[in-house]
Amino acid sequence: MIIKPRVRGFICVTAHPAGCEANVKKQIDYVTTEGPIANGPKRVLVIGASTGYGLAARITAAFGCGADTLGVFFERPGEEGKPGTSGWYNSAAFHKFAAQKGLYAKSINGDAFSDEIKQLTIDAIKQDLGQVDQVIYSLASPRRTHPKTGEVFNSTLKPIGNAVNLRGLDTDKEVIKESVLQPATQSEIDSTVAVMGGEDWQMWIDALLDAGVLAEGAQTTAFTYLGEKITHDIYWNGSIGAAKKDLDQKVLAIRESLAAHGGGDARVSVLKAVVTQASSAIPMMPLYLSLLFKVMKEKGTHEGCIEQVYSLYKDSLCGDSPHMDQEGRLRADYKELDPEVQNQVQQLWDQVTNDNIYLLTDFVGYKSEFLNLFGFGIDGVDYDADVNPDVKIPNLIQG
C-alpha cells in the first residue's frame, strides 16, 4: 500500500515503515559518528524502548556501548491495508541493524505495568543474558492498570490549586489559542501519580532484584522533564509535576537497595523538551517547542532525543564527572535552561500572534520533527512507492 500521513489533533494515525527505518538509521549513524562510549553497560533492559528517549537510549546503549539490549514496549503491528505504529517499525529497524552489527536484540510486546510482562522479561534475561547491568525506565502512557488491584488509573494534565490561563498553538488550524485550564481534583492528581509516578519503576527494580537478574553494581535511571517557569504552571506545578515529584521520592529507596547490591545506583535523568508523541499532547508544548527550536538553532545548541541521550550516557551515566543537581538528578537539559535561551523564549512568547507565527517561531521545524516521529518527511524515502505494512520483528516475545 501507499502510506501517507493522516494527522488527527496531536497524533498521526499512520506510520511509514521505510521512513521509520531511515529515522532509526539516522540516529544510529549519529552515535557511530560520535564514537564509542567508554565504561558503558553491556547488558541493558530498556522499559519503553520503541519511541522517543527510550528508543534513543536503546540505540546509544547498543551502538555507543556495544551492549546487548532487551526492549519492552506496547505497539501494534501492521497488517494488510493498515499500517502498524511507528514504535513497531522503529523496533523492527533496530533489530535489523543490531543483527547486522552482531548485537543481541530481543523485545517483548505488552503492558509493562503488568506482572505478566515483568515475568516474561525476567525469564528472557535468565535464558539469554543471565543478568543486566543497566535498566532504563522510559514509559509514557496515559493509563495504567494496577497489577495488584486491577484498578485502572488515567493521567490528567491539569494545574493544581488554581485555574491557569493557557497560551498554545492549535497545530491543525495554525493559530494561537488562549484557553483556561481548571485545576485537578485530588483524585485526578492521585491517578496521575499512579500512572506516571515512581511506583512501577520501583516494582520493576524490586522484581528484577528478587529474581536475581540484576548484576551487582547495576544502575538504573528514569527519564523526566522539569522545564522552566514558562511551563511550570501546567507541568512542574501541575498534576504531571506531582507524578514527577513522586519519581524524586521513589528513587531514594531504589538507590538504597541498589547501593546495597554491589554498589549500584539509581538516578532520575532530566532531559530537554523535544517533539515526541507524549509532548505533542501537552497543550502549550507545540508553541514552546517552536519557540525553543528557533532560539536554540540560532545559538547552535538545538538537540533532539539522540543527541541528548548520547551526551547523558557519555557525560553522566558512564562519565567520571556527571552533571548532577542538588537533588541528585542527572541533568542533560542545561542548554535549554540557559537563562539567555529562556529569556528569549519568554520575550517571543509574549509577542507571538496569528500573523507572525512563522516569523517568530520555528513551527516549520516543529511540524517536520513531528512528522519524522511517524516516518514521514525523511530525506531519501520514496513516499509514492508501494510498501508492505506487515513488517515482522525477529526475536519478539508477544505478551
Swiss-Prot record:
Q: Which residues bind NAD(+)?
A: 48-53, 74-75, 111-112, 139-140, 244, 274-276
Describe which pathway this protein belongs to, using the record's wording.
Lipid metabolism; fatty acid biosynthesis
- Which is one Pfam family of this protein? Eno-Rase_FAD_bd
Q: What is its EC number?
A: 1.3.1.9
Supply the InterPro entries for this chain: Eno_Rdtase_FAD-bd_dom, Enoyl-CoA_Rdtase_cat_dom, FabV-like_NADH_b, Trans-2-enoyl-CoA_reductase
Task: Name the enzyme group at the top EC level.
Answer: oxidoreductase
Origin superkingdom: Bacteria
Task: From the UniProt record, list the reaction(s) this protein catalyses.
Answer: a 2,3-saturated acyl-[ACP] + NAD(+) = a (2E)-enoyl-[ACP] + NADH + H(+)
Q: Does the keyword RNA-binding apply?
A: no
Biological process GO annotation list? fatty acid biosynthetic process
Active site positions, chain numbering: Y235
Alphabetized, the UniProt keywords read: Fatty acid biosynthesis, Fatty acid metabolism, Lipid biosynthesis, Lipid metabolism, NAD, Oxidoreductase
Where is the site labelled Plays an important role in discriminating NADH against NADPH? E75
User: What start-end ranges are recorded for coiled-coil regions in this protein?
Assistant: none
Q: Does the keyword Nucleotide-binding apply?
A: no
Tell me the GO molecular function terms.
enoyl-[acyl-carrier-protein] reductase (NADH) activity; NAD binding; trans-2-enoyl-CoA reductase (NADH) activity
Which residues of this UniProt protein bind substrate? Y225
Query: What is the documented function of this protein?
Result: Involved in the final reduction of the elongation cycle of fatty acid synthesis (FAS II). Catalyzes the reduction of a carbon-carbon double bond in an enoyl moiety that is covalently linked to an acyl carrier protein (ACP).
NCBIfam families with a match to the protein in the record? EnoyACPredFabV, PRK13656.1
- Which protein family is it in? Belongs to the TER reductase family.
Provide the assembly information. Answer: Monomer.
- The name this protein carries in UniProt is Enoyl-[acyl-carrier-protein] reductase [NADH]
Native species: Yersinia pseudotuberculosis serotype O:1b (strain IP 31758)
The organism that produces this protein has a lineage beginning with:
Bacteria, Pseudomonadati, Pseudomonadota, Gammaproteobacteria, Enterobacterales
